[in-house]
Structures are given as structure tokens and as C-alpha cells.
Swiss-Prot record:
Possesses an unusual extended V-shaped dimeric structure with each monomer consisting of three distinct domains arranged along a curved 'spinal' alpha-helix. The N-terminal catalytic domain specifically recognizes the glutamate moiety of the substrate. The second domain is the NADPH-binding domain, and the third C-terminal domain is responsible for dimerization. Catalyzes the NADPH-dependent reduction of glutamyl-tRNA(Glu) to glutamate 1-semialdehyde (GSA). Homodimer. Belongs to the glutamyl-tRNA reductase family. During catalysis, the active site Cys acts as a nucleophile attacking the alpha-carbonyl group of tRNA-bound glutamate with the formation of a thioester intermediate between enzyme and glutamate, and the concomitant release of tRNA(Glu). The thioester intermediate is finally reduced by direct hydride transfer from NADPH, to form the product GSA. GO terms for molecular function: glutamyl-tRNA reductase activity; NADP binding. This is Glutamyl-tRNA reductase. The keyword Transcription does not apply. One of its GO terms (biological process) is protoporphyrinogen IX biosynthetic process. CDD domains: NAD_bind_Glutamyl_tRNA_reduct. Pfam families: GlutR_dimer, GlutR_N, Shikimate_DH. The lineage of its organism: Bacteria, Bacillati, Cyanobacteriota, Cyanophyceae, Synechococcales.
Length: 436
């Protein structure tokens, strides 16, 4: 068995490729079942965010397993192999484990150290458990990754003042406003007519950062108006006007700055729509949805400026240097957590031998106990029989404790295999199985 991950991220693929591979929660079960149905894949879980799609698996054979996952991604995206392959990465075993730890800690994020990725890894664990696509190996790995992410944020400075995709989007708007005025600095949004389209987690973070940046008010649109009103209630100090998504045209006609973050599969704003509107001002669109909510052709419309998640690099690079130093602190934690998981994985090699040893001793115990009880006669009470049986089981457990502990302890693989062979020979057990 082998741990493997195949995927792509903001580091390897532009948003126009990433959006084709995005797997929304409503189709996650189908995707997991499809992958789990492949005889090469024993366990699987999927991490799908605006900046990455990564499929973590336990496979029978690394090359064949990775090939099966790549085939699935090609079918899911509709992209030809030659168009998709250059954007994919894959890691096997210890590299896959180390990569997941980095992802959960936020060290592989566009915004270094951002906290939202940890929530997304938790969601990956929850969906994998709900849809029963994970077994003991991935459960252990992903649970430890979540713990690692928490540990990095509590034991290092990386989580201090960490920014997110949403906060970077707000800063990008401030930067573009400043550049439009001939200043390469962040400008206040106080005079902007701002709208947020969508009422999910990203929109919540947008409202949080807009309020912190001094925004004077926001128009909040959502398909379900009630959800928008529920969200706005959490920001009593920020004037929020809630509207249904049907009022999108009005929003685009009156606002000067519009953020979009919906779960729509197709763009909700394109050039043909904007050309029909009588706009009152210059319109700046910032789209943090994946798939994208804003069609790429809007840049052809006069008086319209559009940015997507890939454009966040411009603002993120301005404050990454200090965070790079903080990331070095986190690397120590990641190396330790990766080592701990791999030691646990190596210890699994001893499990078949331990189980056979326990079964052998249990059979001997049961046989000898039965012989002894048969000689006790009818005067031996049921209570006394239970006491003797418990005594015999306790003796077996005491005998097994030290050898089992030693077989599971961290050690070089050749030494462990030699110990397993000795135990198997002494107790006439079957040879231990090799664990890849």
C-alpha cells in the first residue's frame, strides 16, 4: 500500500484551468465514489478550494494509482491529457505526507499562513468520513494534518496577523484605487459604492475586512435574500443593504466596486450584460469565485476593470517577505509531525505478526484453560471460572506487552523486519507481510 496525492494549485495552474477541475460539495460524493470504485484506490479524500484541487489516496501501486487519478481528472475536467498534464503534480509516500502538512499549515497557500485552508482541510476530513471513502490510514493522516495546522498557528508566529484571500481581495481594491489616482499605495474605500455578491464564508470575510478598512456601506446580494440578511445581522456596525440576486443589474449599474464570491458553475456577469447597462461610474470587479463568476470578456467593455484570484499575487507579494521568515519556524513543526506519522506508518508493518502472535497465544490459553477447568469438576462455580479465565488473559497480555511495544517502536526498517522474522520463527508463525 502507498500514500499518494495528485493535484494542481495556484502554483501550477492558472484560474482558467483550476476552475475546470473544481469539485463543489454537492458533487463530492459522486466523485469520491467514482475514485473509490477503481481497484487501484483503497482510500480517497478530496481537497477542493479556489486555489487548489488535491486528491489524497491510499493506493495499491503508486504508478498505477497516480495514473488512475490523472485519468479521473481528465474525464472530470474535459481537458485533453496534453493540456492537463503540465499543470498536475503528484507526490508519493513521505513527500505526499510532507506536502499535506505544508498545505494544512498554510505554507503552500497563495497568502502565506492564511487560516482558511485549515477549515478547508477539516471539511475534507468531514466529507471523506460522511461518504465513507476513507479508512484508517487516511483518517489518521488527515486528522494529524489538522492537528499540525493548529500546532503551527499556536506555537509559531505564522498565524499572527495572518491574511486571507478575502482580505487580499479588499487590499487589491485599495491598491487599484490608489494606482488609478497615481499613488502606489492602499487607499480608503470610504467613497466607493461597494457591493458583495454571495453570502457564503468568503463573503463573510469580505464584509469583515471591508468594515475594518473603513467602508461606509455595502450592498449584499444573494439568491436567497434571507441568507444575506442573516449574514448582515452579524455586522451591526456596517450599513448593509440586502437584495436578491435578481437585482444584480441594478448593482452593476450603480456601484463602483463589486466583489463576487458565489458557487455558480458559470459566469454571472459577462460583456453582453454590462453593455446593456447604463452605468453611472467606472466599475471595478474583483472575482474570488472558482469557477469564476466574471467572464474574461468584460475587459473589452469600456470603463470596466476586472480582477480574479490570480491577480491577488500583486498585493500578496507586498507583505510576504516578513511571513517567509515566520514560515521557517513552522518548518520545524512540520518535519516533526511528518516524522511522527511515518514512524506510525512503519509500525503497521508489525501488525500482522502481532495479530498472529496474539492469536497463537490466545489459542494456547483457551486450550489449556479448558483442560484445567475440566479437571475441576462441577464444584467449581461459574464465578470462580470467570476469575481463572480473567487471570489467564491477564498473563497473556503481560507476556505480550513488552514484545509488542518493541515491535511497534520507531526503528530502522531492516531491524524491524529482522525482529519480525525472529518472532515468526520462534512461534512458528507465517512470515510477516511486507508493507510498502
Amino acid at each position: 500500500m502507498h500514500i499518494a496525492v495528485v493535484g494542481l494549485s495556484h502554483r501550477t495552474a492558472p484560474v482558467e484551468i483550476r476552475e475546470k477541475l473544481s469539485i463543489p460539495e454537492q458533487t463530492m460524493e459522486t466523485s469520491l465514489q467514482t475514485l473509490r470504485g477503481n481497484d487501484q484506490i483503497l482510500e480517497v479524500s478530496i481537497l477542493s478550494t479556489c486555489n487548489r484541487l488535491e486528491i489524497y489516496t491510499l493506493v495499491r501501486h503508486p504508478e498505477r494509482g497516480i495514473s488512475a487519478i490523472s485519468d479521473f481528472l481528465g474525464q472530470h475536467s474535459g481537458l485533453a491529457t496534453e493540456d492537463l498534464s503540465p499543470h498536475l503534480f503528484n507526490f508519493h509516500h513521505d513527500e505526499a505526507v510532507a506536502h499535506l502538512m505544508r498545505v494544512a499549515a498554510g505554507l503552500d497557500s497563495l497568502v502565506l499562513g492564511e487560516g482558511q485552508i485549515l477549515s478547508q482541510v477539516k471539511k475534507m476530513v468531514r466529507l471523506g468520513q460522511e461518504h465513507k471513502s476513507m479508512g484508517p490510514i487516511l483518517n489518521r493522516l488527515l486528522t494529524q494534518a489538522v492537528s499540525t495546522g493548529k500546532r503551527v498557528r499556536s506555537e509559531t508566529n505564522l498565524g499572527t496577523g495572518a491574511v486571507s484571500i478575502s482580505s487580499a481581495a479588499v487590499e487589491l481594491a485599495q491598491l487599484k484605487l490608489g494606482q488609478a489616482q497615481g499613488e502606489d499605495q492602499l487607499m480608503t474605500l470610504e467613497s466607493e459604492l461597494v457591493a458583495v455578491v454571495g453570502a457564503g464564508r468568503m463573503s463573510r470575510l469580505l464584509l469583515q475586512h471591508l468594515q475594518a478598512k473603513g467602508c461606509s456601506g455595502v450592498m449584499l446580494l444573494n439568491r436567497t435574500r434571507q441568507r444575506a440578511e442573516d449574514l448582515s445581522a452579524d455586522f451591526p456596525e456596517l450599513p448593509v443593504e440586502c437584495r436578491p440576486l435578481d437585482d444584480l443589474n441594478h448593482c452593476l449599474s450603480t456601484c463602483s466596486l463589486v466583489f463576487t464570491s458565489t458557487a455558480a458553475d458559470d459566469p454571472i456577469v459577462d460583456a453582453s450584460l454590462l453593455k446593456q447597462l447604463k452605468r453611472r461610474s467606472f466599475l471595478r470587479l474583483i472575482d474570488i469565485g472558482v469557477p469564476r463568476n466574471i467572464a474574461s470578456d468584460v475587459v473589452d467593455v469600456p470603463g470596466v476593470e476586472s480582477h480574479d484570484v490570480d491577480d491577488l499575487h500583486e498585493v500578496v507579494s507586498r507583505n510576504q517577505e516578513a511571513r517567509q521568515q515566520m514560515a521557517k519556524e513552522a518548518e520545524v513543526v512540520l518535519q516533526e509531525e511528518t516524522r511522527l506519522f511515518l514512524e506510525w506508518w512503519d509500525s503497521l508493518e508489525a501488525v500482522p505478526t502481532i495479530n498472529r502472535l496474539r492469536a497463537t497465544l490466545e489459542a494456547i490459553r483457551a486450550e489449556e484453560l479448558q483442560k484445567a477447568l475440566s479437571r475441576m469438576g462441577p464444584d467449581f462455580s461459574a464465578r470462580e471460572r470467570k476469575v481463572v479465565e480473567a487471570l489467564s488473559k491477564g498473563i497473556i497480555n503481560k507476556i505480550l506487552h513488552t514484545p509488542v511495544t518493541q515491535l511497534r517502536a520507531p526503528q530502522a526498517r531492516p531491524e524491524r523486519q529482522q525482529a519480525l522474522r525472529v518472532v515468526a520463527s520462534l512461534f512458528e508463525l507465517d512470515p510477516p507481510l511486507e508493507n510498502g
